[in-house]
Curated annotation (Swiss-Prot):
Gene Ontology annotations for the cellular component aspect, listed alphabetically: blood microparticle; dimeric IgA immunoglobulin complex; extracellular exosome; extracellular region; extracellular space; monomeric IgA immunoglobulin complex; pentameric IgM immunoglobulin complex; secretory dimeric IgA immunoglobulin complex
One family name in Pfam for this protein: Ig_J_chain
Organism, as annotated: Homo sapiens
Purpose of the protein: Serves to link two monomer units of either IgM or IgA. In the case of IgM, the J chain-joined dimer is a nucleating unit for the IgM pentamer, and in the case of IgA it induces dimers and/or larger polymers. It also helps to bind these immunoglobulins to secretory component.
Gene behind this protein: JCHAIN
Predominant cellular place of this UniProt entry's protein: secreted
Name recorded for this polypeptide: Immunoglobulin J chain
Biological processes per GO annotation: adaptive immune response; antibacterial humoral response; glomerular filtration; humoral immune response; immune response; innate immune response; positive regulation of respiratory burst; protein-containing complex assembly
Amino acid sequence: MKNHLLFWGVLAVFIKAVHVKAQEDERIVLVDNKCKCARITSRIIRSSEDPNEDIVERNIRIIVPLNNRENISDPTSPLRTRFVYHLSDLCKKCDPTEVELDNQIVTATQSNICDEDSATETCYTYDRNKCYTAVVPLVYGGETKMVETALTPDACYPD
């Protein structure tokens, strides 16, 4: 009897896991900003009030990196206590895209708030694709030298 109950319990957990995974797969990733530790997904669901109507559901996940420094490249800088997230800045896509319009190919961006000055954004964690360095003291043979070291070696030293 115990084996029978255990089998049905394991089967129920497996079916629930498959159902949750299927729901995650139908989400569309709108933003995955590793620099700001933010991810925004979207999916279309049926309205519980009107079955003929669909609703767009947004899921905004922000991971606040505690114990991070104001300047992530400087381990002596003070701890960051203020995190600012602007949804419009997270969602803007300023990369130019080629679009065909009236049999002509036009270069356009998907956002109308692109500005060259706003290109430098504050990162709350390391962007693994960007090279970060810091100057650290190195003691070798009784001599102390200040050397530059890579904080993200994979991005700083190509294969």
